[in-house]
Amino acid sequence: MLNDNLEAQAQAIFTSWFVDFEPFEHSIDEDGAPLPPADWKTGILDNCIDFLNGYAFKSDDLLDEPTDECYDVFKMGNIKKGGGLNYDGTKSWIARDCCQSLERFILSSGDILMAMTDMKENVALLGHTALMDIDDKYIVNQRVGLLRPNGYLNISPYQIYLLTNNATFLQELRRHAHIGVQVNLSKEDIINSQMYYAPAEINLAFATKVKPLFDCISLNNAEIVQLTETALQIQAQLSR
């Protein structure tokens, strides 16, 4: 609940800055909707990120339980509805020895993971993202898109994460989804998403403003993981 409140605060700041443009001098259109400041530009997400589709692991290589030398396989279940990282969502693991040529799929802090498919009858997860806050623990699976911010105009992982979970952005992204048995997003759908580019100094100021919120979220997550691991260890000892 605390993390939900922190994320809501961060999203409110993002909306104020990059959707409503409240801190900046701007105009409105004939319907009263805010227009971006004159020195902002319109572009696409592709300029801000390096995109990679998740790896298609062979089912025979996956483990049902973790070992001392394995990666958690990051699947869509690791992304929360509404956005966020679900540490309890891991259902598969893979030995590190099987991943020696897959370094680019190993996740690092600041990576953003997007759900690329969903159920046609109940689209709830499609397009939502998680922001990775731990290094060398997860490796990304197929049906999850890996978005790595590249530093363009000082646009931070926080900004991309909040953008991709913003209701306005999601509505437009999902409009381009492909509908079959399931609803799917392609790489092109994602990287060609429209966005506004603020000047670099504004993006840097935004990152500085929201970083304390995300630091608190990461700290809370780390404590939750530690408590969970301790509880499991105690449970294992008691069951002997």
Locate the predicted segments by residue:
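Non-cytosolic juxtamembrane linkers/loops
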Residues: 150-155
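A short glycine-rich beta-alpha junction/loop motif
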Residues: 137-145, 174-204
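Short, well-ordered beta-strand micro-motif
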Residues: 75, 146-148
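Short, ligand-facing micro-motifs at secondary-structure edges
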Residues: 80-92, 112-140, 158-162, 171-176
